Amino acid sequence: MNRQEKSVEISELSKILSSSGSVVVAHYKGISVAQIRTSKEGXREAGGGVKVXXNRLVKIAVRDTSVKEVSDLFVGQSLIVYSVDPIVAPKISVNFANDNKQFVVLGGVLENDVLDQCSIKQIASLPNIDGIRAIIISAIQFNATKLLRLLSAPQAQVVRALSAFVDKNKQS
């Protein structure tokens, strides 16, 4: 790789690091090329990506960001999994690590915060943004329906009482 190609690679890595909601760093020693290709396809389908790059280039790209500490993770055969949605990259990484024991999640970055391996696993267990929205909407809808029933109950009781009073007067 010549100097110009390295410069292009560094700028591409900087763009990925700055525009992603989350980035996960992992070791892939012992993983076949076919398995990495499969993980790249899975990440693309989920709205993310997987990038294998020379550690030195990634360290240079990270140097100008607010998460310089993550550069310590780039030792050995490392790759990055990234996504705009903060939960997608951790989910992809942890799922791939569960299927492939040689794939080791080291840590990562979530919106300018450096995370360790345990934090990545916790984030991966969360529902994605659409799932969170569905939970919030269902809670709002349930509470709105319950409130409507509570507000209409006294009116219904008054109407029933008046109806009974009218029926009683008609009979007399």
Swiss-Prot record:
It holds the Pfam family Ribosomal_L10. One of its GO terms (molecular function) is large ribosomal subunit rRNA binding. CDD domains: Ribosomal_L10. It comes from the Bacteria. Part of the ribosomal stalk of the 50S ribosomal subunit. The N-terminus interacts with L11 and the large rRNA to form the base of the stalk. The C-terminus forms an elongated spine to which L12 dimers bind in a sequential fashion forming a multimeric L10(L12)X complex. PANTHER family: 39S RIBOSOMAL PROTEIN L10, MITOCHONDRIAL. NCBIfam families: PRK00099.1-1. Belongs to the universal ribosomal protein uL10 family. This is Large ribosomal subunit protein uL10. It comes from Liberibacter africanus subsp. capensis.
